[in-house]
């Protein structure tokens, strides 16, 4: 009608959008000064780089590592993605940066491993197969990722939960022997024969105490019962369930 308007409220509409990651060049300018009397030159030191004489910042290095190991994105695919953004990075360059990143964080990894393995009374251990591409062959081999977990929340312990990982090209029993060389205590694990050397009296440092994993034991009875309806397997499942009930009642208590 042409009359004046007054605000009476508002409606808000939201939508989810995505802003792709962007590269940026961080430029550090370090001015140099010379003493008028003695000509001595002073200048702030160059910023630290995780990659010696490299041009990758910490954010980019972290992104490459997470994309590779957490998102399972091979370096050649990362290179293709970065090229779409106008940044050409050879896979050999990315590989070198990744190796330098691993070297830079290794002291923290070693500290975590010592704290978890040597500083724990009870550990949970397991391994999982990992396909590994064999360079130059186009084929994959089966490596192993070993995980050792400390979690004292079940019995009211004071130490925080933590996990450490080791990678190996195979599943030989010498692997857990080396991983747990500094550990002394109880190991909760499945019945894999490769762990048996840890429970042997001939183990340097003494035998570990074996605590078999009930979840793995239960799985065998569950499979038999599902396939055959065995009453014996059903009885075993019921008894294991009763043990689980006791554990739930004790959870978190010292």
Which ranges hold each PLM region?
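Catalytic center-proximal scaffold of phosphoryl-transfer enzymes
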Residues: 6, 27-34, 39-254
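Charged, often Cys/His-bearing segments associated with DNA-binding zinc-finger transcription factors
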Residues: 1-32
């Amino acid at each position: 009608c042409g009359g004046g308007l007054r605000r009476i409220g508002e409606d808000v509409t939201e939508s989810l959008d995505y802003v792709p990651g962007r590269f940026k060049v961080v430029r550090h300018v370090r001015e140099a000064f010379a003493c008028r009397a003695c000509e001595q030159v002073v200048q702030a030191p160059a910023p630290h780089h995780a990659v010696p004489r490299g041009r990758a910042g910490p954010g980019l290095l972290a992104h490459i590592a997470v994309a590779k190991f957490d998102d399972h994105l091979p370096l050649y695919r990362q290179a293709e993605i970065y090229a779409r953004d106008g940044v050409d990075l050879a896979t050999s360059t990315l590989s070198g940066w990744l190796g330098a990143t691993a070297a830079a964080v290794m002291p923290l990894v070693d500290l975590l491993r010592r704290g978890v393995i040597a500083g724990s009374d009870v550990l949970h251990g397991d391994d999982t197969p990992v396909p590994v591409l064999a360079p130059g062959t186009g084929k994959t081999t089966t490596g192993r990722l070993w995980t050792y977990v400390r979690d004292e929340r079940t019995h009211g312990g004071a130490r925080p939960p933590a996990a450490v990982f080791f990678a190996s090209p195979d599943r030989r029993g010498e692997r857990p022997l080396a991983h747990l060389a500094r550990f002394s205590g109880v190991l909760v694990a499945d019945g894999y024969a490769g762990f048996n050397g840890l429970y042997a009296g001939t183990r340097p440092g003494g035998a570990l105490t074996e605590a078999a994993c009930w979840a793995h034991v239960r799985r065998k009875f569950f499979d038999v019962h599902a396939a055959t309806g065995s009453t014996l397997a059903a009885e075993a499942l019921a008894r294991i369930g009763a043990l689980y009930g006791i554990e739930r009642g004790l959870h978190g208590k010292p």
